[in-house]
Amino acid sequence: MILSRSVSVLHLCGVSSSAPSKLLSQRFKVSFALAYGSSVSFRLSSLNRSDRKWVRGFASATEAEVEKKGNDTFFADHTVSWKSLGLSDNVSIALRDSGFDRPSLTQAVCIPSILSGKDVIVAAETGSGKTHGYLAPIIDQLTNTALDSEVTNREERPFPLKNISLILCPNVMLCEQVVRMVNGLVDEDGNPLLRVEAVCGSQGWPDRLPDIIVSTPAALLNNIEPKRNRRLEFLRCVKYVVFDEADMLLCGSFQNQIIRLINMLRFDEKQVSRLAKSNLGRPMEIDASVPQIDLENEDDAEFDEGSISEEEDEEEEEEYLDDIAQMPSVEAEAGSDTKKGWRRVRKIYTRSKQYIFIAATLPVNGKKTAGGILKHMFQDAVWVSGNFLHRNSPRLKQKWVEVTVDSQVDALIEAVKNNNNTNTERTMVFANTVEAVEAVADILEKASIQCYRYHKNHKLDERANILADFRETGGVFVCTDAAARGVDVPNVSHVIQADFASSAVDFLHRIGRTARAGQYGTVTSLYTEANRDLVEAIREAVKMGQPVETAFSRKRGFRNKVKKRAFLKAEEAEEPQAVRY
């Protein structure tokens, strides 16, 4: 991944009201948090669709639908309805009553995949409808299960043995957003179809287990690990596990927490499988049609169902990371019985949980990238890819403005004023640091442009209120990348990069705040000489119709590779096909 190692031309000090367009001489460094530690660029077999065999682990299935519908690159064909995808009447009506008359292309493919019961990995562009794409089928299945349960059993026990869904998000704001979306799907009486609770921030464990728990990894572990009974019953109840923003959750500081949770969930699957195969106790119903999963042979070292020591926890994580390091190459034949690189014998256990991974950016080249880890851990998963994953949306107009220290403020004010003609317009302005956000906001306000300020120095409740006001009233929203990933603000017509993104990943998430849900949008990117390499790489990829992922590479010669990929066909082994729309 190429990073912009520039010093921001926005500065910390105030700008005099008499000269709002002049920049002070002091400049500050921008600190970067590396989202990915390794080079990640996907290999393309060919630009010709007919020749593609393995592109990001996805197969072509319905690409022709986009061409057939012409300019409609968001919605599925008009003949596709919520009910035709397999959803019940209750959920279909709830979606329509919430304003979702038709499924998007993403939803039309991922909903049947999730309803099939298989593990699903959804990698689709921002604003393509991924959240409702996984919520709808999960709510549908949980609703059907709830109808078969006795209400008295649900009320009497805080942890009834029923199916529930666990949704993991990287931060509190995204957790609360998912909760709002679940509560937005209501029945004919206006009541939510299912009970949902957030376990994050100041919100502790619910008194009565809901149908859906939305949590951050750390908050969930803090609430289930200290209490043995809670942990065991909770893990047994979890039927559907969703990892929203999966690329972030599988990298960096989240990785060990996610590994810990997956180990717990998979061990419970192993225990359920053992109980089903034995004649002890009452028989347990296991769906034989659900695929099986490889788990470690732990017969010689049983899982301690009491408290888990730090030493045991670290040992499990080290073993798992060793497994990742020993993963077979991506060229290995799909479905091969030979597990190259695995040191321990593994057994097959019957599946009792479904794992769903959601991401807008998902690099797969490299064993330790998020996509590489998923390809290894969930080899039988269905992969769903958006047509514009890592690409420039055809509904998005991009403007590129190279600026200097003397011209950046004027360019910024002009870009904001050109789009802020009415109070209802929504413009998001991105800067790389908290200090830069404050500097940009000061500049705009001295130019008589009122704006919101959004960054990590605000408390969670303050951020929630700021975001709610912006959603409701519009205006100019100056923010860090805290608002770039996953946050859904409808009708954002313009995104401005006052500081250019530090990586191609950040760039994709920023521009994904506009042109969402089939709408059109504009992105104005201000960049300096220090950003030029990254900008040229992205622009070249966009111009050639290549994924912006080609700009993820750290190597200086990657631009030549972009050109070569248009003419050379890579020699790659055929991988298991999945769904591409």
UniProtKB/Swiss-Prot annotation:
User: One MF term in GO for this entry?
Assistant: mRNA binding
Gene Ontology terms, cellular component aspect? chloroplast
SMART domains given in the database record: DEXDc, HELICc
State a single Pfam family of this protein. Answer: DEAD
Q: EC number(s) per UniProt?
A: 3.6.4.13
Q: Where is the Helicase ATP-binding domain?
A: 111-380
- UniProt record similarity statement: Belongs to the DEAD box helicase family.
Domain comment as written in the entry: The Q motif is unique to and characteristic of the DEAD box family of RNA helicases and controls ATP binding and hydrolysis.
Q: What is this protein called?
A: DEAD-box ATP-dependent RNA helicase 22
Question: Could you tell me which species this protein originates from?
Answer: Arabidopsis thaliana (Mouse-ear cress)
Gene encoding this chain?
RH22
